[in-house]
Amino acid sequence: MSKPIYNRILLKLSGEALQGDEGFGIDPSILDRMALEIKELVEMGVEVGVVLGGGNLFRGAKLAKAGMNRVVGDHMGMLATVMNGLAMRDALHRAEVNAKLMSAFQLNGICDTYNWSEAIKMLREKRVVIFSAGTGSPFFTTDSAGCLRGIEIEADVVLKATKVEGVYDKDPSKFNDAKLYNTLTYAEVIDQELKVMDLAAFTLARDHNMPIRVFNMGKPGALREVVMGTTEGTTIS
C-alpha cells in the first residue's frame, strides 16, 4: 500500500470554505466532512496542524474601508478565527479525533495560548493542533499565519485549501481558457503576479523554502489525494 508523501502538514482553510453555499456562517455538513477528511490523514499517520481564516464571519479590511479603525477590525477578525477553531475542534472531537485549539493571544477558559514546544509535542502524539487568532498581530492575514505556523512546526508543506482546482494563469471564473498549473517556482508566481496568497505570506514561505500546495477542498477526497502524492492541485517550490 502506498504511503503519504508528507509526514507533517499545515492545512490552511479559509473561512469561506466553511460556509458552503450559505454565504455566511458555518455549514455543519461541510465542517463534519472536513473533520472526517482530517481524521483519515491522522489514521494514515500524518501529523496535522490547521490554520483557519475568519472571512465567513467577519472581514476587518472591509470595515476598515468604511471607516472602522483597521486594528480594531483585525482584532475582530482574529476572534472570528477562534470561533471557527472552536467549531472545528468540536467537529473533530465528534469524529473521535484528539484535537487541541490554540490561540495566538490569551483566552483563558476557552482555549490554550499558542506554545511552540507544546504544539510540537502534541503533533508528535498524533493530535491535531488548530492554530487560531492569526499571528496575533493586526495587518497580517491568516495566510501569513498559515505560513508562519507551518515554518515554526517544521511542516513538510503548507496546503492551501481553496474553491478552485489550483493556481491558474488567469481567473477561471471569468475565462474559460484559463490554464491550470501543475507546478510553479516561487519566482514564476511573483513574475507572473499569480494570485496564490498575499505577498507577505508568500515571501515568508519562499524565504524559508516552505513548499505550498494549492488545491480544491470542495472536492471530496482531494486532501487525501494531495497527501498521497497525486498530481492534485498546484505545487509551488
Swiss-Prot record:
UniProt keyword list: Allosteric enzyme, ATP-binding, Cytoplasm, Kinase, Nucleotide-binding, Pyrimidine biosynthesis, Transferase
Annotated EC: 2.7.4.22
GO molecular function: ATP binding; UMP kinase activity
Binding positions (UMP): G54, D74, T135, G136, S137, P138, F139, F140, T141, T142
Top EC category: transferase
Region annotated Involved in allosteric activation by GTP, chain positions: 20-25
Binding positions (ATP): K12, L13, S14, G15, G55, R59, T162, Y168, D171
CDD domains associated with the record: AAK_UMPK-PyrH-Ec (cd04254)
Name of the molecule in the record: Uridylate kinase
Organism this protein belongs to: Haemophilus ducreyi (strain 35000HP / ATCC 700724)
